[in-house]
Amino acid sequence: MSLQSAQYLRQAEVLKAEMTDSKLGPAEVWTSRQALQDLYQKMLVTDLEYALDKKVEQDLWNHAFKNQITTLQGQAKNRANPNRSEVQANLSLFLEAASGFYTQLLQELCTVFNVDLPCRVKSSQLGIISNKQTHSSTIVKPQSSSCSYICQHCLVHLGDIARYRNQTSQAESYYRHAAQLVPSNGQPYNQLAILASSKGDHLTTIFYYCRSIAVKFPFPAASTNLQKALSKALESRDELKTKWGVSDFIKAFIKFHGHVYLSKSLEKLSPLREKLEEQFKRLLFQKAFNSQQLVHVTVINLFQLHHLRDFSNETEQHSYSQDEQLCWTQLLALFMSFLGILCKCPLQNDSQESNNAYPLPAVKVSMDWLRLRPRVFQEAVVDERQYIWPWLISLLNSFHPREDDLSNTNATPLPEEFELQGFLALRPSFRNLDFSKGHQGITGDKEGQQRRIRQQRLISIGKWIADNQPRLIQCENEVGKLLFITEIPELILEDPSEAKENLILQETSVVESLATDGSPGLKSVLSTGRNPSNSCDSGEKPVVTFKENIKPREVNQGRSFPPKEVKSQTELRKTPVSEARKTPVTQTPSQTSNSQFIPIHHPGAFPPLPSRPGFPPPTYVIPPPVAFSMGSGYTFPAGVSVPGTFLQSTAHSPAGNQVQAGKQSHIPYSQQRPSGPGPMNQGPQQSQPPSQPPLTSLPAQPTAQSTSQLQVQALAQQQQSPTKVIPALGKSPPHHSGFQQYQQADASKQLWNPPQVQSPLGKIMPVKQSYYLQTQDPIKLFEPSLQPPVIQQQPLEKKMKPFPMEPYNHNPSEVKVPEFYWDSSYSMADNRAVMAQQPNMDRRSKRSPGVFRPEQDPVPRMPFEDPKSSPLLPPDLLKSLAALEEEEELIFSNPPDLYPALLGPLASLPGRSLFKSLLEKPSELMSHSSSFLSLTGFSVNQERYPNSSMFNEVYGKNLTTSSKAELNPSVASQETSLYSLFEGTPWSPSLPASSDHSTPASQSPHSSNPSSLPSSPPTHNHNSAPFSNFGPIGTPDNRDRRPADRWKTDKPAMGGFGVDYLSATSSSESSWHQASTPSGTWTGHGPSMEDSSAVLMESLKSIWSSSMMHPGPSALEQLLMQQKQKQQRGQGAMNPPH
């Protein structure tokens, strides 16, 4: 057989020469390569021993595959190559063929030599009944070790091919299977190191280079690779830091080993070691490491110790140079210090089961090495660290050792032992273990059994130390129970609670304490955002869960705010809020740009608002509700009380302010929130009467406002309306702070935040909403902009039955225009329960302060537009509207005469209702939204509550695609309020899987904390169509919303009301924003819409002014008829472009 193999080898040499001949074309070279592959395969299968002696497996890889791969890779990387795309295609095809070749070769080798690999799929599983081997008599049976080697060779190169194809997970799997097959061969470990290096994992890279060297058959290139990696680490600059993160510690740790391995700058070892010991203790108590990292650190130390003095040197007398002795001393000191801290950590944290800080595997590995090197106990550095042994004894006694543990003969390897099989420094310790079963050695409760086996082996090592080093440890046997004792006094560490700061990830541990100390109202708000339930208990969770937000908050920490406010903000930070919501916090009119990137939960996100006279200098404190301030001085009819949110004066700063904050346009709301834009705050918000319920609702509004703002609002509520209970704030969008909190809590709600239309919303929120509505039903379009009775009617038509409104028994005074925030209707189907719980309190408390008012829009409001001064708004109508708004359900269970008048004609008419037409004319609504809303008594509420209005619900159900787009920028700001409205239910009904919770935080472009659940609305983007930055429902990206005024054509359109909560399909398909810029989609149609709106407003004026005190079906019917006619005329123009 050797003759035939020799003949194959000669033919292979000829083929290799032909392949290097430049005269041959690609086709001839390809043919020669295929022939060479076939020859080598035959040699490996027929005479494996001969082939391995001739290194055929290496020639096969190098000449048949690697050289060609390297050539194609070089050509593909050359950007000047005009045929790059063709080369890349050829490379992909060649890698695919190479993978197939080695897979087939491995399968054939296993079949021919009857090798059973754990990673191999047997032929029977592939449907192959029999494997008839041809020429079986000609096959020379190889040794089992040769079979294992060639199979490992195939697995390694399969991993290489997968790595070239950027399939890192598959490559790692191949490498690990290869290492398990022959642990004494260093090649798989070298490849794993290369793979880890490509991922930027420096600690794992060094670990596997050490593993590749410290084996029976080290891989030659591993030593060179390790030297290069350590040299590169030494060349990096040192950064002076008082506190290190894990990455800082790893860099310093690798530098330390670079000094030792390369014997360079040894004078730096001692100070660097001391710093490493100090930071290791701090990080370990903070649970910054995981179990695998601790094992890697320990093994790297053991590798260096073994490299300096192996076992052969232990038994013989050797003279060491001064440098070698210094390196050994410093390394051993570092190793023993780490061991002591590892023994102390589980006692301090009492969390052995925690994967984040589980040091026992590293302790086990360290103790195994000490048992193999008994002379180490005589070293001076070990004597200097006798405090280790009392800690070790406490650890062993915590296992409740028994005499039976010493006789345990379980040979099953632990995970750390399985990982380190073949490691020369520990090889003798693993001789009695059975690695043949791989990871399947333990069945049933693996973790529990492994924990007990590890404890038993540690107890056994402790007993060995007690027998051989009685001066350090003694062991007493009391009726089968073991007790370890020592005469060495135990060292009490400095308060390790410092470690519990949760360093790195939790640098702002204060945030957690603040959240814990925060008022129950704030907690409830946070919990609401987090969980559908309104329970305050859930509020605590957000504090712990949203640690990611802490970092962004650090950025804002620079701003000085009252501690009280900071607390609230801290909690808010924990509950990720859409950047848009946070944006409103900033005072600058350009907030839109900043707000996207400033989460509300950040302290700096809420600078003090100088425009608020009554507001305390601390920006975090939210002033009590301000008396109604109507720019026009308009007053509502007697008997009608309008929340301050609705009464915000049109005098509010122009849209610019609103835009900057992206906050709701309602001044009262911004005033409540320190983060509201200064100009907006200056508006009548301040003058809102303390009776406004928004304050009470603020706690429930966690969506929009920061926790601090919520707290401030609660205080203000108590001041303004001490008699009012602080209900769930979630429903009252007017309260920006409340909304922010809710948004933070609810990830899906946060999606709304990104639009951060709060400021624009306050201005022309309703109209803009319609601008952004998709080609959805005119009613739906209208609903976002006009959430007043019109909106109610539309949703009522669709959902009125399912949503019985609260009995129309609210007093006019209690009924606030903001209450018309159709929170209940907005969440009509899924949010009913939540809304039922929250709507009354939230609406009342939030609406007055935070309602978005079209008045705030730069467009001046007509005197009649002012909700207070508008004579067009009949008291009865106001009362009825307020009652409807107050009622959580959209259904009018006990509507006054006005309700039937409104519902009957509006809901039943086949054509568009007045409100529908208004909605269809977003531009008009935008310009006259304040007037219309004030006329209807919904102006403020609609603006503030567009998200929660029943039209939103309708959008949520029917207009999922355009729901987000439909929402106005103001709606986006109101999103927070919507969330607060639905504290119990985070719009789960309309949100499929696109809620913030389902969305990865990282997708949230505006969220400073990508991990935070309630992070900015961008989180929803994953659900929405990729073309838009909208939330799952299609809400435009917060960034777009914030930078541009939604009401302006140049601003991004946003669906902040119910649309954001719609299913992802709505955002992807229906969202007209997708087709065009989200902000300016409707702006192009603004003039026509404004004209129609003006005409409609004039007609309303004439009708309502004539019968102001006698609202009845006749006036409404006339208005509806006019509206219907107008709709028919300009219906085309009213529909938003898609």
UniProtKB/Swiss-Prot annotation:
Here the segments flagged for biased composition (Low complexity) are 674-721, 1000-1026, 1118-1132
GO molecular function term, any single one: protein phosphatase 2A binding
Tell me the residues on which N-acetylserine occurs: 2
From the UniProt record, give one GO term of the biological process aspect: nuclear-transcribed mRNA catabolic process, nonsense-mediated decay
Name the InterPro entries for this protein: DNA/RNA-bd_Est1-type, Est1-like_N, Est1/Ebs1-like, TPR-like_helical_dom_sf
UniProtKB keywords: Acetylation, Cytoplasm, Nonsense-mediated mRNA decay, Nucleus, Phosphoprotein, Repeat, TPR repeat
Q: Which GO terms describe its cellular component?
A: cytoplasm; cytosol; nucleus
Q: Which domain of life is it from?
A: Eukaryota
Q: Name one Pfam family in it.
A: EST1_DNA_bind
* Coiled-coil region list: none
Function per UniProt: Plays a role in nonsense-mediated mRNA decay. Recruits UPF1 to cytoplasmic mRNA decay bodies. Together with SMG5 is thought to provide a link to the mRNA degradation machinery involving exonucleolytic pathways, and to serve as an adapter for UPF1 to protein phosphatase 2A (PP2A), thereby triggering UPF1 dephosphorylation.
Report quaternary structure and partners: Part of a complex that contains SMG5, SMG7, PPP2CA, a short isoform of UPF3A (isoform UPF3AS, but not isoform UPF3AL) and phosphorylated UPF1. Interacts with DHX34; the interaction is RNA-independent.
Full protein name: Nonsense-mediated mRNA decay factor SMG7
Taxonomic source organism: Mus musculus (Mouse)
Q: What is the lineage of its organism?
A: Eukaryota, Metazoa, Chordata, Craniata, Vertebrata
